[in-house]
Amino acid sequence: MTYKRVLLKLSGEALMGDKPYGIDPAIVQSIAEDVEKVIANNVQLAIVVGGGNIFRGLKGSADGMDRATADYVGMLATVMNAISLQDGLERVGVETRVQTAIEMQEIAEPYIRRRAMRHLEKGRVVVFGGGCGNPFFTTDTTAALRAAEINAEVVMKATKVDGVYDRDPNKFNEAKKYSSLSYQQVLSDEIAVMDSTAIALCKDNNIPIMVFDIFKKGNISRAVAGESIGSLIS
């Protein structure tokens, strides 16, 4: 089954590639080329991007910053990533709009739900930056929120691992990968795939979550085509 309207969640760390910080142009190029194939198949795609490659609000708070202030800095980091993604997408011919939850009209449109949906219907990619505009909410929660707002059929969480495991596969060789699991299992077992607010939002709105490896070339288009390449939460 090919999905028709998809919300893709990209972590900021995914944009780093092998770099310790910032944005790897080669990764942006690879993502853009994969997205171009998705759009060519008449799939409507919106993207929520994180900011952890530049600044992470929770870490800033742990280091002594006021939590709300740290979160706002993190929101600005997501806008930097959103604009960089827009540049990469437009260089491969994909018409793209950036919408931000915090107004900065010189560089992006303000987030307006109806306008975002019109862009999608016209075959444009919409990249949502600035989180949801409020501190104390993660970009995973933003992804769940925007998916519900634009009536997306699925949230696709593109990450550094190839699915959901019962423990950290980088630390435990015996870690077990789930091909599928329920929202309730994620919540009750406290599986660290997305925060509980994001999972609950998807559960309440019956939006499945596909978790897959972003670094394998072509995985975005495979996931959109409905291939079983990661873990499905539903």
UniProtKB/Swiss-Prot annotation:
Catalyzes the reversible phosphorylation of UMP to UDP. Its main location: cytoplasm. Inhibited by UTP. One of its GO terms (biological process) is 'de novo' CTP biosynthetic process. GO terms for molecular function: ATP binding; UMP kinase activity. It is found in: Cytoplasm. ATP binds at residues 9-12, 52, 56, 159, 165, 168. Its EC number is 2.7.4.22. The gene is pyrH. It comes from the Bacteria. UMP binds at residues 51, 71, 132-139. Pathway: Pyrimidine metabolism; CTP biosynthesis via de novo pathway; UDP from UMP (UMPK route): step 1/1. Keywords: ATP-binding, Cytoplasm, Kinase, Nucleotide-binding, Pyrimidine biosynthesis, Transferase. Gene3D superfamilies: Acetylglutamate kinase-like (3.40.1160.10). Belongs to the UMP kinase family. GO terms for cellular component: cytoplasm. This is Uridylate kinase. Pfam families: AA_kinase. HAMAP family: PyrH_B (MF_01220_B).
